[in-house]
């Protein structure tokens, strides 16, 4: 089995590659990644010497380069993690999100049509559904929930999903889509809530929390997400969307306080900053379909997952300190410095 994994130097993509090579040592994985600010080649160090792994620096919008890779690898499957994914950045510069997330997806699907594949899988997000009210804890996103995007990021991901489904109906392309809740775990880029709070707390820096911190997210440990995608790839029904959720709803402010307590840091580090434009209030996924059809359930309780995540950041300071000392530092000052 040969699988092309796009965006494999990023957070979820790299964890998926590690999972697949551990579970299927005879599979071959070709990883392509543009290596933007969030793609870190050092993340893939554990598999660089694996004879069944290949890395190619490539933009999914580069049609000629993508076609060349398909000709060389003859993939059976393609899993698309490649995406611009940070909401704040999409508000500052929507164009790059539309380019990568929509047009890049089109290039990949055209390559799949041209060269033939057994499965194309699109990794999407629960953010395409919009948000849920805080006073209705009985409501959850299902696969039938209408798309109702709130940011340029979520609009670009929803557009890509619709394009994937259109290619399935129009051209018969064998596709599946997964929409997941917020992930956390090793190798998470420090612009996102949990790694940002861990890194700042370890450096005794302010912990910037949007608004009042009441926003609720459903948290999914990244390894559980990878196992779900594995199941969908091998056993999911073509043309279907599967929601993947962690059954771990938490307020942002509670997450930050948990991290402070785990690291022995004072809550006085918490600094409330001007809220994000159009900030969604609550995300909550109903994963009944993937459980019913494929037997998947999240295995990691949040208390265990956050502890493992904190320990990973303690043990791998060099990885994230290199990141926050570079271009990211300027971005951080722009986003939080005057709020």
Residues covered by each model-derived region:
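N-terminal Rossmann-like NAD(P)+-binding domain of SDR-like oxidoreductases, especially those catalyzing
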Residues: 1-183, 308, 313-316, 322-339
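C-terminal substrate-binding subdomain of Rossmann-fold SDR/epimerase-dehydratase oxidoreductases
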Residues: 3, 29, 58, 195, ...
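Residues that form or flank phosphate/diphosphate-binding pockets in enzymes
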Residues: 12, 38-39, 64, 188, ...
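Short histidine/acidic/glycine/proline-rich micro-motifs that form metal-
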Residues: 35, 182-185, 215-216, 276-277
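A glycine/serine/threonine-rich, flexible loop-to-helix segment
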Residues: 47, 135-136, 190-198, 274
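Residue-level recognition of oxygen-bearing side chains
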Residues: 65, 96, 103, 146, ...
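The catalytic Tyr-centered alpha-helix of NAD(P)H-dependent dehydrogenases
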Residues: 137, 149-156, 186, 190, ...
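Hydrophobic alpha-helix immediately C-terminal to the catalytic Tyr-X-X-X-Lys motif of short-chain
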Residues: 159, 163, 167, 197, ...
């Amino acid at each position: 089995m040969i699988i092309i994994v796009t965006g494999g130097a990023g957070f979820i993509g790299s964890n998926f590659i590690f999972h697949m090579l551990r579970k299927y040592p005879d599979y071959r994985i070709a990883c392509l990644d543009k290596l933007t600010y969030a793609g870190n080649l050092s993340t893939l160090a554990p598999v660089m010497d694996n004879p069944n792994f290949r890395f190619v620096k490539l933009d999914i919008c580069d049609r000629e380069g993508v076609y060349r890779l398909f000709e060389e690898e003859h993939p059976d499957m393609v899993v698309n993690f490649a995406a611009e994914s940070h909401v704040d950045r999409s508000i500052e510069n929507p164009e790059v999100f539309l380019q990568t997330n929509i047009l890049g997806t089109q290039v990949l699907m055209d390559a799949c049509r041209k060269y033939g594949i057994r499965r194309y899988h699109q990794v999407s997000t629960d953010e395409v559904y919009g948000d849920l009210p805080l006073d209705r804890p009985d409501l959850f996103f299902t696969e039938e929930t209408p798309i109702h995007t709130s940011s340029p990021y979520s609009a670009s991901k929803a557009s890509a999903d619709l394009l994937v489904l259109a290619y399935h109906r129009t051209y018969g392309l064998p596709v599946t889509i997964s929409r997941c809740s917020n992930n956390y775990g090793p190798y998470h880029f420090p612009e996102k809530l949990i790694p940002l709070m861990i890194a700042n707390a370890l450096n005794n820096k302010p912990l910037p929390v949007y608004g009042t911190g009441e926003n609720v997210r459903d948290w999914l440990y990244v390894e559980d997400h990878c196992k779900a995608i594995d199941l969908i790839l091998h056993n999911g029904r073509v043309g279907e969307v599967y929601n993947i959720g962690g059954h771990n709803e938490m307020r942002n402010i509670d997450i930050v306080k948990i991290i402070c307590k785990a690291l022995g840091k004072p809550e006085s580090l918490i600094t409330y900053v001007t809220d994000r434009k159009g900030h969604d209030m609550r995300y909550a996924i109903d994963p009944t379909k993937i459980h019913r059809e494929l037997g998947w359930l999240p295995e990691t309780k949040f208390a265990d997952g956050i502890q493992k995540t904190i320990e990973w950041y303690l043990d791998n300071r060099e990885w994230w300190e290199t990141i926050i000392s570079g271009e990211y530092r300027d971005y951080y000052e722009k986003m939080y410095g005057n709020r």
